Each structure stands twice: as C-alpha cells, then as structure tokens.
Amino acid sequence: MTGWRRFSSIRPFEARTARTLCTAVAGASLLVGCGVLPGTSGGSKDPVTVMTWAPVGSNATNLPGMPAMAKAYARWANASGGINGHDLRVLTCNERNSSAGAADCARRAVKEKAVAVVGSYSQHGREFMAPLEAASIPYLGGYGITEEEFNSYLSYPVNGGQATLLAGNGRQLARNCDRTAMVRPDTITGDDFPDLLDSGLAQGRRGPAVDIRAAEDASDYTRTATRAREQARSGGCVTAVLGDRTETFFDSYRRLPDDGRDIRVSSVLGNIGQALVNRTGGRSGPFEGAYLTGWYPVASDPAWQPMRKVIDTYAFGDNDIDATDPGTQTTWIAYTALRAVIGAIDDGEITPGKITDTLDRGVKVDTGGLTPTLRWRYEDMPGVPGFPRIVNGDVTFQVVREGRLVAEKKGFVDVGHTLS
C-alpha cells in the first residue's frame, strides 16, 4: 500500500543508558504550546515524568481531549498516592497538526527527561519517532494514525490504529451495502485509506470502493458530496473519513436535494461520535441509521464507568474532555497500561529502559473489558505485513438507532487477519 513501509525497525542490542528523572516543580515555566501538571501527593519514590501530545486549535483534526484526559488521570492517581508510590508528572504539548510541531513535542519530551510518551496523537510519525528512538523513549498507546506506530521497536499500541478501523469499516459495510463510495483526505496518510477499506470489503465479497479525494481543510463539500452520492447509487453507502471535517462533509451531504434513493452513510469513530449525532438532531438528524466502526465498546458500556468517574471528579469541568471520543478513550487505556507497567517495576526510579524491558517481557494489561488483555511480547504480535507491532486487531460494529450509538454486533470483531 502506498506510504506504508513493509518492514519493522530492528531493536538495537546496545543496553539503554539509565536516565535520572527531574523532580516536578510546581512553579515551573511552560514553553509555548506545552503544559505540565506536577505531581502533588508527595510520595517517597521518585516522580515519573511522561508526555501526552495532540493537535489543538489547528485547521484540521484536533484532539484536545487527549492531553486533558492525561491531566485528569494524573490528578486522580496523585490524589491516591501516585502509581506504586510514584507521583505522576504529566507534560502536555500542542502538536499543532504539523511536522514541525510533532518534532518539537518529541524534542521537548527528551529535554524534560520523560520516561514515555503516552496516549498521544500525531500524523507525523517520522518526525516524532526519530527523536524518541534516539533517546530510547517508548511511545505507549498512540492513537494509531501512522505507520511508525506499528513499525518502531519502541512503539506499544493499544489498538490496531486507523488500519483496523478502515478494514473493519469495509467488513461492516460489506454486510450492509451493495456498493461503497469513500471520501478521504487528499494527503499522504489518506492515500492508504482505500486499500485498507477495500481489504475489508473484499473479505465480505464486495468490490473496491470508489475513491473520492477531498481537501482536509475545506469549508464546503457540496461537489464532493454530490459525486459520492452518485457513485454509491441506490442500496449503497457513502463512508467519509476526514477527521474534524467529516462533520462539514456530512453537513454538505444532507443539504443535497432528496433524489429518493436509499443510501446509507458511514464513518469510523473519531470522525463521527455521539456528540456529533446529538448536535445534528439525534434521531431526526442525518446520522440516523449510520454505520460506524470503532476500536472499543460503545460509550454507554459499563466498562467505561471508571473513566467517567475520574472525569467527573478530576477534570474540573474541562470542556475539552468528551468521554465518548476515541481519542480521550485511547488516552485512558494508554495510562491504564502505564499504571500496570509502573506497578510491575519494583524500584524507586522509573526509566525509559525499565519501561520498555517490562513491556517486552510481557506485562499483562487488563483494561476491564475495553480491549482484550494487552501484551507486547514477540509472540503476541501476529506479524501483519506493514503493521508488525499490532497486538490488538479487534474492532466493534456500531450503528445509530433512535439517535444513540449502539452495538450493531455484540462484542469484538478481529480484523487483524483482514490486513494480512
């Protein structure tokens, strides 16, 4: 597939240099685009410094809920004595949806002696992984939008990334649609989307989707929406994966004159969510009946209750946090993994090397039913071509009914083999 390198990075054999963590200073100054939440519990062990980054306020995709969730998690952890006696110090950085921003955040993580980058989002894998690899800093629980997250020996993904969402979306649409038109960004990252969607369609004995490119930052998609509807035809589906501009696309789509044809709409979680369904009219809106593919259980699932309690108690009314957003959810799961790793290290000092060694040796992460049990040993990786670091190939099929996102199919669907 275009843009996805068919190899994995080879782990160097040199021993990692131990790094001494800087203690948190409550009055520390903040660099532009970055913040820090110091630990507050006064634990006897050294504090653990980590970073979470995501784009905020950019002209394309924005995920402010990820750093906001990281801060809330740290408040919760530190209020109860930290993680295994360690205060959790969270740095946040605005990646700005740019290659320069991604590189700046990674260099900031190195400078601040972060022991891991946790629960973050960036489309610029080469720019952020190079500095992290040079400093041997692990990348734990990234959103999964770049190839480096599934190739780098220092990446430990908690989901199957955009690849499994798109392959899963193809599987879901193959069950319900005679023909599919796909609207995706005209970017290098977007160039991979059709092949991934088509792999799922083929698994369901459907032909390839019609590939429709669109500007990632457009303010109107009327012409694109018209073409997509024409290509889908009656009995078909239009699926759009445009990040934050997915809402703009479907706003243009719903304004098209009714032509009497039965065409369903679709996307993947993170492009459409419960908040968007609510904003656009709920059961009487354009997303009623829409098919959606996600990584995790529906937001109403009881397994999310611990996260919701933390948000309610420690987010201090932070409007950036949406408990139904998969970015927020991914950050929660990534920090759950971090907690398990630190809990398995019986030492007063936590270093990047100790974290990676613990992950590589097979620490088990129980996410309470939000994912399968996660482990990152070599034998836990099925060796999917182009995505060798995937350990969780599961997705969920969801549908909008009566204005609510509900499970279309109970439980998880493993699409890892679809990518093979």
List each model region and its residues.
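Segments of small-molecule ligand-sensing domains
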Residues: D318-T328, R339-R404
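Extracellular/periplasmic Venus flytrap/periplasmic-binding protein
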Residues: Y153-D258
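Extracytoplasmic "Venus flytrap"
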Residues: V36-Y73, S80, C93-A100, D186-D191, ...
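C-terminal motif of bacterial Sec signal peptides marking the signal peptidase cleavage site
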Residues: L30-G33
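Extracellular/periplasmic periplasmic-binding protein-like sensory domains
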Residues: Y253-I333, F412-G416
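Periplasmic-binding protein-like
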Residues: A109-S122, L140-G142, T180-R184, I212, ...
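Beta-alpha junction/loop-to-helix N-cap segments that form part of ligand/metal-binding clefts
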Residues: K45, N62-A68, G81-F150, E216-S219
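Short beta-strand elements at the ligand-binding edges of bilobed clamshell
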Residues: N94, P138, E147-Q172, D211-R213, ...
